[in-house]
Amino acid sequence: MTASSPSIRVTDLSYSVAGRELLSKLKFHLQSGEMLAVLGRNGAGKSTLLKHLTGELGKSGVELFGQPLRDIKPAEAAKRRAVLPQQTPLSFAYEVLDVVLLGRIPHGQRETVQDRAIAAACLERVGLSGYETRDVLTLSGGEQQRVHFARTLAQLHGVIGERVLLLDEPTASLDLAHQHATLRLARELCREGVGVLAVLHDLNLAAQYADRVLMLAEGHVIACDHPAVALTPESIRTAYGHEVLVTQHPCLNCPLIVSAS
């Protein structure tokens, strides 16, 4: 793989269930150090796409770090590709630090003092320093989501070479301040060379934080470009069936989307 090759490349990815096409000939890529936001209404194919990128629904049409996904052993992929699902329910009263330490499993069979230090540092990055011995089941939904975000940070920590982080609606259960804190941290990871793909519902968060947006409608790509190019009233109408006004944010160098009705 060359330095300019994508961390993820999707080529002619299609997927159907019971004769219904959920994804149709998708084609896009994710570069190292880039944040790509995946947008679209419910049922557009966002979660189905994410399950293909993880190999859950099949591995054809997807390359990871320049290799076909089907040729990469799961244990090797786990060292360099981390996934934050929208929901990660836990049934047992794990301590918070132990949950974060799950992210270190791909890197060795035995837990080390260094692993615990890494996990604690990752908790600090998500604003949960001091929560190490808390029962994860006593935390709010948003706090639990941040614990799992710390787990993905621990999973990618110290890895040499390309890394990818897949986020499925990472801001869904968070308040306003933590939505922005989470996406600012995602941007920090991009500056560290991580390729970040995030499924988002909030168009303005995507406009503010993403380098590019991939907009889906009924399993088709209708736009894949910089937010200022892709987020137009026409593309948003096609994707969401709703009229919007798109203007320039008064403080930030990005589009601002407001409802027209």
Curated annotation (Swiss-Prot):
Quaternary form?
A: The complex is composed of two ATP-binding proteins (HmuV), two transmembrane proteins (HmuU) and a solute-binding protein (HmuT).
**EC main group:** translocase
Query: Please, which domain of life does this record's source organism belong to?
Result: Bacteria
List the InterPro entries hit by this protein, alphabetically: AAA+_ATPase, ABC_transporter-like_ATP-bd, P-loop_NTPase
Q: Provide the protein name.
A: Hemin import ATP-binding protein HmuV
Which terms in the GO cellular component ontology are assigned?
plasma membrane
Q: What does this protein do?
A: Part of the ABC transporter complex HmuTUV involved in hemin import. Responsible for energy coupling to the transport system.
Query: What's the main place this protein lives?
Result: membrane
Q: Which UniProt keywords apply?
A: ATP-binding, Cell membrane, Membrane, Nucleotide-binding, Plasmid, Translocase, Transport
Domain (ABC transporter): residue spans on this chain: 8-243
